[in-house]
Each structure stands twice: as structure tokens, then as C-alpha cells.
């Protein structure tokens, strides 16, 4: 029997009861404005780089108040469909890989805070970067290897400055992520590291000094394998490094909890 078959009173009663139990939510005015503007942008009524009408014009066009227009524009900005600068009308833009990944940020933080969440993200990073170093060993240009060498040099110069070491550590891995030339890889990698670093416990400079030295030596091993065009060794060095990093932060987190 079709869900739209009206021949059964029982079916009608069941559907009626179901609808009474789950009333449809009404859309906010801002959501309706957002949807209409999004459709207009996607249809090309407002071209990329062009400006949308002013807030006052949008208020008159949709017959809504300023808060509804501003909420709609803010939602479109989150989707990467418009850029908003103070004092200027919203300008149509094209969603980037960064926009796509940033939309996942809230969900990612929820996953990270769940039991086993950090371990799952660490595994994701391991799988992801394993492919990156293999690709780098097989395909990196001499110029890209030179950039990686420079990042490694800065990393080694930062051993005694923890904040600088973290930045140079991230930069070393960022250069790896740039080698394939895929913007989605870059956006994913940046977000993944941001999420994992934010989830790490706060520890003293002294505790991290030994860890920094170990990480730097592991970076050297990764670089050498890529320079030597050895994807298997690059993968082994990367796996050793990331597993070491994960184990170190787990140990630091446990010691901090036990000290409380």
C-alpha cells in the first residue's frame, strides 16, 4: 500500500497521530532569506566578485527586518558564498577548500572530546600523512625538497623556544602537505593539526624540551628518506614519528592528571 493511499482509515489515523507527535518546525525569516539569496547566487543573478544589494535594499526586497538580513548574510559567509567587510556591501565569493573544512570544525571538536576521539584523529593523521610522504618521495621537485630542507633547518634552530618549535614543526608538515598541490589536502591538513594541537594538555617548557629534540631527529629521518627518493623508508620514518608524538602526549596527559 502506498503512503499516499487514502483508502484506509487506519492509515490516515496513524499518519495523523504521527504528525501530531512531530509538528513541523517553522523556518525563521533569516533562513528563508538565506535560501533565496543562495539560490540567486547559484543561478548567477549575482556574479562572483559582484556586490549584493545593500542591507536596506534587501530588507525592502524581502520585507524583513535588519536582523533577519544580517543573520542570512552571516550564514552565507560561513558557507563561503559571500565576503563581508565592515562598511561595505557583501561581495559574492566562491567557496574554498578552507571554507568546506571549517564547516566541520564544530563536529570535529565534539568527536575529539568523546572517548577515543583523539586516538581516532591521530589515526586519521597517520593514514593521511603516510600517503603524503610517499607521494613526496616519488614526486617532489628539487625546489620542493629545498623548501622542506629550509623548514627543517628552522625547526632545528627552534629547539630551545617551545612556541617557535611548535610553529616550525607545523610548518615542516605543512610543506609536506603542499607538495601534491591539492588545496583540499592543504585545508584538511591545517584543520587536522589545529584540532589535535588544541586538544593537547598544557605542559611545562621543561617537559617538552626532550620531546622537541626527539621530534627534530625524526623530522631529519623523514627528510632524508624523501631526499633519497625512498617512499618505503619515508613511510617508516613518518609512522615512527607520529606514533612517538602520540605516545608522548598520552604520557604527558596522564602525568598531568595524576599530579592533580
Swiss-Prot record:
Query: Does Repressor count among this protein's keywords?
Result: yes
Q: Name one GO biological process term.
A: negative regulation of DNA-templated transcription
* DNA-binding region, residues: 55-74
Chain residue ranges for the region called Disordered: 1-21
Q: Which HAMAP family match?
A: HTH_NanR
Q: Which PROSITE patterns does its entry note?
A: HTH_GNTR (PS50949)
InterPro entries documented for this protein: GntR_C (IPR011711), TF_FadR/GntR_C (IPR008920), Tscrpt_reg_HTH_GntR (IPR000524), Tscrpt_reg_NanR (IPR023730), WH-like_DNA-bd_sf (IPR036388), WH_DNA-bd_sf (IPR036390)
Q: What is this protein called?
A: HTH-type transcriptional repressor NanR
**What protein family is recorded?**
Belongs to the NanR family.
Occurrences of domain HTH gntR-type (ranges)? 27-95
Alphabetically sorted, this entry's keywords are: DNA-binding, Repressor, Transcription, Transcription regulation
This chain is encoded by the gene named nanR
Tell me what organism the protein belongs to: Klebsiella aerogenes (strain ATCC 13048 / DSM 30053 / CCUG 1429 / JCM 1235 / KCTC 2190 / NBRC 13534 / NCIMB 10102 / NCTC 10006 / CDC 819-56) (Enterobacter aerogenes)
Q: Which purpose does this protein serve, as stated in its record?
A: Transcriptional repressor that controls expression of the genes required for the catabolism of sialic acids.
From the UniProt record, which GO molecular function terms apply?
A: DNA binding; DNA-binding transcription factor activity
Amino acid at each position: 500500500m502506498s503512503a499516499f493511499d487514502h483508502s484506509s482509515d487506519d492509515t490516515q489515523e496513524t499518519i495523523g497521530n504521527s504528525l501530531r507527535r512531530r509538528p513541523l518546525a517553522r523556518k525563521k525569516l533569516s533562513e528563508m532569506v538565506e535560501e533565496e539569496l543562495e539560490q540567486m547566487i547559484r543561478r548567477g543573478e549575482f556574479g562572483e566578485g559582484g556586490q549584493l544589494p545593500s542591507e536596506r535594499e534587501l530588507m525592502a526586497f524581502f520585507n524583513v527586518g535588519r536582523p533577519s538580513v544580517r543573520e542570512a548574510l552571516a550564514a552565507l559567509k560561513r558557507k563561503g558564498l559571500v565576503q563581508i567587510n565592515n562598511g561595505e556591501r557583501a561581495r559574492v565569493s566562491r567557496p574554498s577548500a578552507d571554507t568546506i573544512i571549517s564547516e566541520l570544525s564544530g563536529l570535529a571538536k565534539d568527536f575529539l572530546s568523546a572517548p577515543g576521539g583523539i586516538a581516532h584523529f591521530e589515526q586519521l593523521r597517520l593514514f593521511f600523512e603516510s600517503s603524503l610522504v610517499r607521494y613526496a618521495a616519488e614526486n617532489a621537485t628539487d625546489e620542493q625538497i629545498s623548501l622542506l630542507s629550509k623548514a627543517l633547518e628552522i625547526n632545528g634552530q627552534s629547539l630551545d623556544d617551545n612556541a617557535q618549535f611548535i610553529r616550525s614543526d607545523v610548518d615542516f608538515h605543512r610543506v609536506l602537505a603542499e607538495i601534491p598541490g591539492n588545496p583540499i589536502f592543504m585545508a584538511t591538513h591545517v584543520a587536522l593539526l589545529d584540532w589535535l594541537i588544541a586538544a593537547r594538555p598544557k605542559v611545562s617548557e621543561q617537559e617538552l624540551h626532550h620531546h622537541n629534540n626527539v621530534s627534530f631527529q625524526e623530522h631529519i629521518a623523514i627528510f632524508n628518506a624523501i631526499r633519497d627518493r625512498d617512499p618505503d623508508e619515508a613511510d617508516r620514518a613518518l609512522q615512527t614519528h607520529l606514533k612517538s608524538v602520540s605516545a608522548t602526549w598520552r604520557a604527558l596527559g596522564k602525568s598531568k592528571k595524576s599530579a592533580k
